[in-house]
Amino acid sequence: MKHLHRFFSSDASGGIILIIAAILAMIMANSGATSGWYHDFLETPVQLRVGSLEINKNMLLWINDALMAVFFLLVGLEVKRELMQGSLASLRQAAFPVIAAIGGMIVPALLYLAFNYADPITREGWAIPAATDIAFALGVLALLGSRVPLALKIFLMALAIIDDLGAIIIIALFYTNDLSMASLGVAAVAIAVLAVLNLCGVRRTGVYILVGVVLWTAVLKSGVHATLAGVIVGFFIPLKEKHGRSPAKRLEHVLHPWVAYLILPLFAFANAGVSLQGVTLDGLTSILPLGIIAGLLIGKPLGISLFCWLALRLKLAHLPEGTTYQQIMAVGILCGIGFTMSIFIASLAFGSVDPELINWAKLGILVGSISSAVIGYSWLRVRLRPSV
């Protein structure tokens, strides 16, 4: 019991559980004895009906769209705190992750096109390596425990959120044909209500969560990635203390263990089970997976590092307090963990063309993401001194 308490008290425990869940998913998805059970679990239908409103999704989509909205709510709360009171409080500090994210989307896409521009079919997947899986990137960072400066963690969070917002915009503009304007209208009204609640000084967290559920439902029905709702709600919950209590900080404290020990491991288990059946070396070295691997493993860190260097040289932004440029470069490598968002874009790009292309894209995403995780973790482990 003492050892168990010590483990869960460790800053690295959440990351360790997430990695174990991902490995378990890979084993189960590729084992003849368990692959059927694994996929049956993910395809289990779950229906929610309130009056005429009906949401009918399988277990995988409930995990990715609903539970991960809670994770993004927590991320929104943490980034807001740093924007208002912490390491992103000045304009130049806040500009740094924005500039980094822009570079981290442009360069991987260009590198992918360098491999695939001549093929009009695979060319459609240009946005695949532009995405970052914030959950897995933060999970790998968590393995380093307390040696990670808070400012570096917040930089990764802010960068990944902007990256995700960019990916959502790309999906809406280039990969979505049937956006529901009515649902987007409801979402806009819900956001306006959240803003009014904040301006009027309403401090009951439950009211924001209730409006957030309406917002989440509207965003889900609109065809846009529903997890965006979590970030928006997090930004509107009041941070300012009154009588020694802050609604945002209190909710952040409540959500942390649920996200670290339930939501993120479940997310990893549901999404890491990529089948390796039929994988050959010839297929792996074809232009589609090679373009994705190059985009994630080379394009991401190159784009982030280059744009950060330019921002510093032109005095457009400052390094986060207590961090070094080498640490920023290592975080850039971690951002090459594209995984679930990249897989989602691949399914949109190739789903109506050739299912086999999705499998090769998944393989490229898997190789690029795992390589980025291992190299990024190793570099940071060398660059970060253990806390005393």
Swiss-Prot record:
UniProt cross-references to InterPro entries, sorted A to Z: Na/H_antiporter_dom_sf, NhaA
Sequence ranges on the Periplasmic membrane side: 32-58, 117-122, 177-180, 223, 273-286, 351-357
Catalytic activity: Na(+)(in) + 2 H(+)(out) = Na(+)(out) + 2 H(+)(in)
GO cellular component, as recorded: plasma membrane
Annotated HAMAP family: NhaA (MF_01844)
Transmembrane regions listed in the UniProt entry: 12-31, 59-80, 97-116, 123-130, 155-176, 181-200, 205-222, 224-236, 254-272, 287-310, 340-350, 358-380
Family: Belongs to the NhaA Na(+)/H(+) (TC 2.A.33) antiporter family.
Keywords linked to the UniProt accession: Antiport, Cell inner membrane, Cell membrane, Ion transport, Membrane, Sodium, Sodium transport, Transmembrane, Transmembrane helix, Transport
Cytoplasmic topology ranges: 1-11, 81-96, 131-154, 201-204, 237-253, 311-339, 381-388
Membrane topology classification: Multi-pass membrane protein
Protein name: Na(+)/H(+) antiporter NhaA
Gene that encodes the chain: nhaA
Record has rRNA processing as a keyword: no
Chain's role: Na(+)/H(+) antiporter that extrudes sodium in exchange for external protons.
Lineage: superkingdom: Bacteria
Localization (cell): Cell inner membrane
Molecular function, one GO term: sodium:proton antiporter activity
GO annotation, biological process: regulation of pH
